[in-house]
Amino acid sequence: MTTLTHRTRRTEVSKSCEKKIESEEDTNQERSPDNEDPGDSKDIRLTLMEEVLLLGLKDKEGYTSFWNDCISSGLRGGILIELAMRGRIYLEPPTMRKKRLLDRKVLLKSDSPTGDVLLDETLKHIKATEPTETVQTWIELLTGETWNPFKLQYQLRNVRERIAKNLVEKGILTTEKQNFLLFDMTTHPVTNTTEKQRLMKKLQDSVLERWVNDPQRMDRRTLALLVLAHSSDVLENVFSCLTDDKYDVAMNRTKDLVELDPEVEGTKHNATEMIWAVLAAFNKS
């Protein structure tokens, strides 16, 4: 589980960076939950996994921080939320014995292909698995964090590289080779900085200018991305360009959001249960 921390920086640098981001035209307006299609929508340019990885990548170097050990599980959580939002999976209904989000199993709703290799591979695993598993177990299985050798087949391999290749195909990243003394490493520097800055601006606005203080009134994908970015330990990258005052406000509001009780929020009207189930799984880990 990641933690939200305060930091001290030179205000001049943060103001300069903030001004640069705000100067970019926000061409893709946030969609309201009422207009959001839970199925495959051509309006959704990036998947949640692609957005999380893009936020975690160093722009020029083209790789995530070597010290970030949270992003792998964060990406797997993003896969589950993305599948739920596309109407492919859902949590079994609550019963007297299984009320908690983490006690309820992930069930298949539709096995129709999504067009995304990682999503379809995960969908295939969920369809073939008997007995069914919980959200927390699926995150562990997809990450490969299991002691059961018979469950290792469910591990998704080379996830970051495969997501990066998708972003290359979409014109947001490029592919390079870098030499690190004893070995060569494939990296993916950001080429479309406008798209990344648009994404960062959207998250910044969601906890600043457009803050609604009620997750049920937030855009579903923005809420999911905030939860995943926090769990993947990449939110510092998003907020580091803000002035100190705005940084503190953004971090405190995000902290309040991720510290809400998932069991309570998941039962509210129009709540996306999978978002809160994934958050509950990360809070427990």
Curated annotation (Swiss-Prot):
**MF term (GO), any:** phosphatidylinositol-4-phosphate binding
Subcellular location per UniProt equals:
Golgi apparatus, Golgi stack membrane; Golgi apparatus, trans-Golgi network membrane
Q: Where is the composition biased (Basic and acidic residues)?
A: 10-43
Q: Does the keyword Isomerase apply?
A: no
State the residue spans of region: Beta-hairpin required for oligomerization: 176-187
Listed A to Z, the keywords are: Golgi apparatus, Lipid-binding, Membrane, Phosphoprotein
Chief subcellular location: Golgi
Annotated stretches, region: Disordered: 1-43
Q: Which GO terms describe its cellular component?
A: cytosol; Golgi apparatus; Golgi cisterna; Golgi cisterna membrane; Golgi membrane; trans-Golgi network
Q: Which residues carry this modification: Phosphoserine?
A: S112
Protein origin, superkingdom:
Eukaryota
Q: Which cysteines are joined by disulfide bonds?
A: none
SUBUNIT field: Homooligomer. Does not interact MYO18; differs from GOLPH3 by its inability to interact with MYO18. May interact with ARF1.
Q: Which family does it belong to?
A: Belongs to the GOLPH3/VPS74 family.
What is this protein called in UniProt? Golgi phosphoprotein 3-like
Q: Which organism is it from?
A: Rattus norvegicus
